Swiss-Prot record:
Gene name tied to this protein: mtnN
One Gene Ontology cellular component: cytosol
Protein name per UniProt: 5'-methylthioadenosine/S-adenosylhomocysteine nucleosidase
Active site positions: 14 (proton acceptor), 199 (proton donor)
Record keywords: Amino-acid biosynthesis, Hydrolase, Methionine biosynthesis
Oxidoreductase listed as a keyword: no
Annotated EC: 3.2.2.9
UniProt source species: Haemophilus ducreyi (strain 35000HP / ATCC 700724)
Gene3D superfamilies: Nucleoside phosphorylase domain (3.40.50.1580)
Catalytic activity: S-adenosyl-L-homocysteine + H2O = S-(5-deoxy-D-ribos-5-yl)-L-homocysteine + adenine; S-methyl-5'-thioadenosine + H2O = 5-(methylsulfanyl)-D-ribose + adenine; 5'-deoxyadenosine + H2O = 5-deoxy-D-ribose + adenine
Keyword Hydrolase (UniProt): yes
Pathway(s) served: Amino-acid biosynthesis; L-methionine biosynthesis via salvage pathway; S-methyl-5-thio-alpha-D-ribose 1-phosphate from S-methyl-5'-thioadenosine (hydrolase route): step 1/2
UniProt cross-references to NCBIfam families, sorted A to Z: MTA_SAH-Nsdase, PRK05584.1
Biological process, per Gene Ontology: L-methionine salvage from methylthioadenosine; L-methionine salvage from S-adenosylmethionine; nucleoside catabolic process
Amino acid sequence: MKLKIGIIGAMAQEIEILRKLMTDVSVLEIAGCKIYEGKINNTCVSLLQSGIGKVSAAMGTTLLLELTKPNMVINTGSAGGLAENLNVGDIVISTEVRHYDVDVTAFGYEIGQLPANPAAFLPNEQLVNMALKETKTAGVNAVAGLICSGDRFVNGAEQITTIRQHFDQVVAVEMEAAAIAQVCYAFEVPFVVVRAISDIADKCSHLSFEEFLPLAAEKSSEIVIAMLNNFS
């Protein structure tokens, strides 16, 4: 049986390059989510445009896993860089994923941890290593580390300071990965997050995001395509 790879991006711009490469495509639209099933370079894929934010991401990921049954999930798209050695267009790869806007510490949980869930969601090690290998082959600067998710666009020093107080190893922030990881954890489906930096999360990050989202989409898609070639 051929493997099927699930790929998730929040916005149309983040999956456009991948969608245009697909052949034998069928489209399913449900509850605001779009799922494209087909092939990229002879690899079976189910490509989800989930919508922005953790609720949309969780809903879309659940639909993707239930309806198309992928063997693994790659979350792609853009992220805001927090590591000092990251620039726009660089790649971030998850070694763990956490919610930064969850607090149930009153009941003894870690900051960012939801009841009945681990504090950190761990990606599949083989997928992490594959992503790192492909970034090296492509000559792209990549940082592997903690990616944190929350339902806000991080834009300013005060927000960054608050996140770093709790998650001092964070390399990037965005708005969907922890929800995707949580659903994959519940379904026992391996995942990895491979995103490109569209902005450095400072007070001007919203301007950088608008300007460099196409570049981030291009760079992240490049690595995802290279990863898919390992399965064809």
